[in-house]
Amino acid sequence: QMLGFRGSAEVVGASILTLAVGQLLAFGWTATFLAYAAGLVVLVLFLLFVPYGKGEAHESKQKTEEAAKLTRSMLQLIFFLAIGAAVIVCTNTAITFRIPSLMIEAGFGDAQLSSLVLSAMQLIGILAGISFSYLISAFKEKLLLVAGVTFGIGQIIIALAPSLWVVVAGSILGGFAYSIALTTVFQLISERIPAKLLNKATSYAVLGCSSGASLTPFVLSGIGFITTDGRMTFIILGTWMIATSVLVSFLLKKEA
């Protein structure tokens, strides 16, 4: 449940910043970089309110050695989940990059309107966070597969959309599934990895997320060699997401 609330808080911030970027466009594209100033607010709040006990820096050598030991099966589990997280984040970032151009190409709206669509896509993550506890109870280990496939379908709906409202519907479906899928990755880690090893395992999953975001421009460039059509780009991304979800879920089932 706390993982769900964390996901909700994340998307609130992301949607507010996306909306702010859309409004800052009126002052020129360079003004949009002011959105990064929000990081300074986060830093100040972190320094003021997050407790840091000095005793934590003096952990026993025994605990440190124990925390360093991840078994082969654990490493495989973490690797598969990190790959899944990388593709989830990569495709989501690609959507953020490509929805504005797709809407302009299709005549559905301009860059400012696309920022509203992206904000709606992210705000639905609040509902995803609230409902995560129920969904994980209902689908259990199949939730990653269900959410990943749904995320891919959302992207394909965007690609085939005949109107703005269908783009909005596909974006909302994709945004909901994205939040659920990414939260499920960390839930599976916390469920299957011992508490003393959880920090290390989580750091690998976060590395997967960061890798996915950083690889997005290269992935889009690679797709650009295949097609320059915006709709086809979303179909490729959606298919990739579905295939990855099926593969990762299959590998996780074998490891269970």
Where does each model-flagged region fall?
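Helix-to-loop junctions at the C-terminal end of transmembrane segments
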Residues: 128-140, 224
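Structural signature of the two symmetry-related core transmembrane helices
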Residues: 143-157
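Extracytoplasmic gate region of multi-pass secondary transporters
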Residues: 77-118
